[in-house]
Amino acid sequence: MINIRKTHPLMKIVNNAFIDLPTPSNISSWWNFGSLLGICLILQILTGLFLAMHYTSDTTTAFSSVTHICRDVNYGWIIRYMHANGASMFFICLFMHVGRGLYYGSYTFLETWNIGVILLLTTMATAFMGYVLPWGQMSFWGATVITNLLSAIPYIGTNLVEWIWGGFSVDKATLTRFFAFHFILPFIITALAMVHLLFLHETGSNNPTGISSDTDKIPFHPYYTIKDILGIVLLILTLMLLVLFTPDLLGDPDNYTPANPLNTPPHIKPEWYFLFAYAILRSIPNKLGGVLALVLSILILALVPFLHTSKQRSMMFRPISQCMFWILVADLLTLTWIGGQPVEHPYIIIGQLASIMYFLIILVLMPVASTIENNLLKW
């Protein structure tokens, strides 16, 4: 009798995706982040569901309902902080996952990569709307500033912003619709993640060398299930260290002040994982230019497969490209730092230089480095 996991219509899908999946024998820990993102998503949906049971999306009660969750609901504080810091862990894993894709040339799987870019954008939208829900000062002003950017769109901009707001300012209608979208988007993300996986399993995984591994495959279970479990344990450990010891480390103290439309905080800034894009936005003095740069800073990822000029897929044997990659990482860290600083003398010029470097590395220096390496192969 054939094993039921190979014949049952539902178990067959699980089996082909997580048990008998032929996997390259040499994939490193950089390939752990896909499963970690899945765990983060499940964790966020579960904690979010329990938070939604006690949260009210009305401007008069939103802030106090979050306080109520932390003070009066059994283990409400841990659910709330796991959700808030879970978002940070989610983005750490996302950035690592994208970085892995860039370094090892995984972007040559076009469908998988493009769905990944859509997933990144959807996750960013979800996180932004979630940040508005506690209705603190930074929630309100963050929502005001970011939605206002759409007014830079010629002709329809102002109408578009007021349509999103549901009025002439960020108010009850805005908060209610943001809650609705914040609730539904994670399920859309789940569906997209399944499509992401579907396309990945059409081609099979890439590996650190970037060379076809069809001649050397091993079953996903038990080899990579046990490896993933180690990653999950480390992820949960890091998350719980954050939640139990420094739950507000990555948050903004301004968000403990209820939203007040009459009082603007001195420094409006988003959560840390958006700071790099925020720095690029601020580095351009023109509003429309800034918005375009902001959008392009993420959408540029969709161009990466077309900028690949190297004869080799992975950067494993390409030292010049490796240097470029790590300069790009340093540049993104610089942008993240600048995004959290006030708009004054040294920071403005550093932000502008870092923004130019970001686009220059991806659009010019990396393809040039690849071409140089191609020529060096002929020597």
UniProtKB/Swiss-Prot annotation:
Cofactor, how bound (note): Binds 2 heme b groups non-covalently.
Pfam families tied to this protein: Cytochrom_B_C, Cytochrome_B
Compartments, record wording: Mitochondrion inner membrane
Positions that bind a ubiquinone: 201
Subcellular location, principal: mitochondrion
Keyword Transport applies: yes
Domain of life where this protein originates: Eukaryota
Alphabetized InterPro entries for the sequence: Cyt_b/b6_C, Cyt_b/b6_C_sf, Cyt_b/b6_N, Cytb/b6-like_sf, Cytochrome_b, Cytochrome_b_C_euk/bac, Cytochrome_b_N_euk/bac, Di-haem_cyt_TM
Binding-site residues, heme b b566: 97, 196
GO biological process: mitochondrial electron transport, ubiquinol to cytochrome c
GO CC terms in record: mitochondrial inner membrane; respiratory chain complex III
UniProt keyword annotation of Mitochondrion present: yes
Binding-site positions, heme b b562: 83, 182
Cofactor list: heme b
Listed GO MF terms: metal ion binding; ubiquinol-cytochrome-c reductase activity
Assigned keywords, A-Z: Electron transport, Heme, Iron, Membrane, Metal-binding, Mitochondrion, Mitochondrion inner membrane, Respiratory chain, Transmembrane, Transmembrane helix, Transport, Ubiquinone
UniProt xrefs under PROSITE patterns: CYTB_CTER, CYTB_NTER
Transmembrane regions listed in the UniProt entry: 33-53, 77-98, 113-133, 178-198, 226-246, 288-308, 320-340, 347-367
Membrane-related topology note: Multi-pass membrane protein
Family stated for the protein in its record: Belongs to the cytochrome b family.
Function field: Component of the ubiquinol-cytochrome c reductase complex (complex III or cytochrome b-c1 complex) that is part of the mitochondrial respiratory chain. The b-c1 complex mediates electron transfer from ubiquinol to cytochrome c. Contributes to the generation of a proton gradient across the mitochondrial membrane that is then used for ATP synthesis.
Descriptive protein name: Cytochrome b
Organism annotation: Capricornis crispus
Lineage: Eukaryota, Metazoa, Chordata, Craniata, Vertebrata
